């Protein structure tokens, strides 16, 4: 699918998404993969990729998920990279049937990843659909932009792991979201939580100081991952090794667990 084109400038009001009823969800894909980001890199996980996102980050590596998808591509069988298609929207019983082959006892998937797009844009659907998914006995791992505070509150009891972004304006090309990130992190704290920061050659020291200070105010033991840019869409210049070393030291002045981890699935040529 070709990258979605937005009529909004970076940092402007949220891009309008197709209205989705609570009993229905817009899902772009369901598939098996090796987690390539964050502190659980290397684990086998089942991914549910939601369609639609309110942001237009310059470094976005999944522009096809920025807008609602016409069809949901379901890997069949899991791990084959062969897909069948079902029409959107996807009702909760359809989702339950789609994930069942991925979550059999011999599938070795450690958790179910909700990714996007922005899964919390469909919080009402998550409240309806996740209980049946959780019944398979796997943890639910939420990947999110870290800004939809009320939506997180509404589904937090159904989530086990929160992997949230912090979005430096000097990386994203958008307006600052620090206040939302701070409140979101506070709400997420009862769960296992990690923070991901995509960094480019233009990422600024003041922005990284904001990340450091917000996380340290909430809990200095929270893991923070500096993720070097994988060239994509509007961002092409990766940070230098010297920058990454300096930035890790800057955050480590107040934080206990700061790591530099690239997108490992991209190195493998995977989804």
Which residue stretches match the model-derived regions?
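Conserved Radical SAM active-site core
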Residues: 3-14, 25, 59-158
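Intrinsically disordered, low-complexity boundary segments flanking structured domains
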Residues: 13-18, 35, 213, 246-250
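Short, basic/aromatic-enriched C-terminal tail that caps enzymatic domains
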Residues: 3, 14-31, 256-271
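N-terminal pre-triad scaffold of radical SAM enzymes
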Residues: 21-66
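Conserved AdoMet/S-adenosylmethionine-binding subsite of the radical SAM
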Residues: 108-111, 119-271
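Conserved Rossmann-like nucleotide-binding pocket used by diverse enzymes
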Residues: 49, 115, 225
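Flexible mid-to-C-terminal extensions adjoining Fe-S/redox cofactors in radical SAM and related proteins
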Residues: 2-3, 50
């Amino acid at each position: 699918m070709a990258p979605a084109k937005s009529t909004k400038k970076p940092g402007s009001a949220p891009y309008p998404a197709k209205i989705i009823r609570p009993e229905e969800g817009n899902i772009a894909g369901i598939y098996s993969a090796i987690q390539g980001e964050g502190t659980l890199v290397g684990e086998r996980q089942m991914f549910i990729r939601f369609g639609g996102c309110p942001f237009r980050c310059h470094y976005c590596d999944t522009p096809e998920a920025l807008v609602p998808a016409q069809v949901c591509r379901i890997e069949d069988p899991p791990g084959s990279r062969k897909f069948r298609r079902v029409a959107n929207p996807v009702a909760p019983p359809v989702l339950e049937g789609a994930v069942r082959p991925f979550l059999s006892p011999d599938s070795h998937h450690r958790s179910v990843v909700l990714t996007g797009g922005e899964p919390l844009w469909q919080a009402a659907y998550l409240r309806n659909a996740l209980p049946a998914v959780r019944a398979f006995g796997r943890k639910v791992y939420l990947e999110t932009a870290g800004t939809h505070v009320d939506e997180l509150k509404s589904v937090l009891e159904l989530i086990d792991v929160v992997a949230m972004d912090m979005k430096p304006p000097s990386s994203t090309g958008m307006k600052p979201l620090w206040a939302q990130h701070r409140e979101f992190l506070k709400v997420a704290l009862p769960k296992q939580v990690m923070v991901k920061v995509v960094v480019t050659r233009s990422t600024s020291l003041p922005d990284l100081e904001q990340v450091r200070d917000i996380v340290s105010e909430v809990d200095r033991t929270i893991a923070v991952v500096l993720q070097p840019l994988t060239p994509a869409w509007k961002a092409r210049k990766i940070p230098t090794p010297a920058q990454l070393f300096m930035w890790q030291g800057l955050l480590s002045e107040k934080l206990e667990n700061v790591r530099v981890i690239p997108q490992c699935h991209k190195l493998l040529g995977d989804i």
